[in-house]
Amino acid sequence: MGNLFTKSTYEWIKQVDTSKADLFKQAEESMMKLQDQKTKEDFVQEQVKINETYSTLEHFVEEHRKELATLSPQHEQDVDILLQSLKLRKETLMRYELPNWNVAHNVPIYDVEQHPMVLRDRMMAENLEYLAEEMYPTEKMIVWGHNYHVRKNNSKVKYADYGQNFLNNMGDYLPDSFKKQTYTVGIYAYSGASLDSSDNKTVTPVNKEKDPTSLESLLKYANHSSLFVDLVHTPYNKRTSWIYTPRIALYWGFLKEEMILKEQYDGIIWIERITPAKII
């Protein structure tokens, strides 16, 4: 049954109301199957049904807040997280899923802001702001995400082979006042392989062909198995000019990107050889 969130939430709600737990399970399963709809009319009809179900679940959680809180380690805070998660399910359903379906069915998208990849990152930025300002306003946070999502100005990064700029990402949509409070780290590898997140099965090797002035190649010269490079406190000079000038780096170890590292990251973690993750 779905992922860890789905399983744990189902068991949590089940302790209060079995029928609502089953309703939650049904909504999650329907959400996963939504992209299988053959026509837009069928899609929208199913979309409305799922949205109504999540609204019913939101109302249930609000009504049974105290009961649910007593059954959870962090009590009230866990209920707040659950409500935010249900809200995000609805927003994903109503803002992201149809554009994603359109792309899968070759329906043209004329407004780049309505592209599912852009919508996804805008929603990520909105959620991060909520977590930082509303849920954990006095605490430090660690946000783990792919380089593509966390770097600060993704729209300035280019596909090196085509000269075309990337789409806006989460970092682009975060306000400057927010970004000034963050320390953003990019992670890159020289060799090895990683697990493809699209199926958690395919092993994708790191491209062996390297530009001699690329990020990966330059840090290889240090002759260490791993490195951390701070970019914030590194002044410009002849030896550090590579941080301030356009540089090739590999997206997921295989796609050439061109960027000015200083515009994107506050630090870099470089690993000489990576190995694929093992799914537990």
PLM features: residue spans?
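Structured catalytic-domain cores with a bias toward divalent-metal coordination
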Residues: 1-280
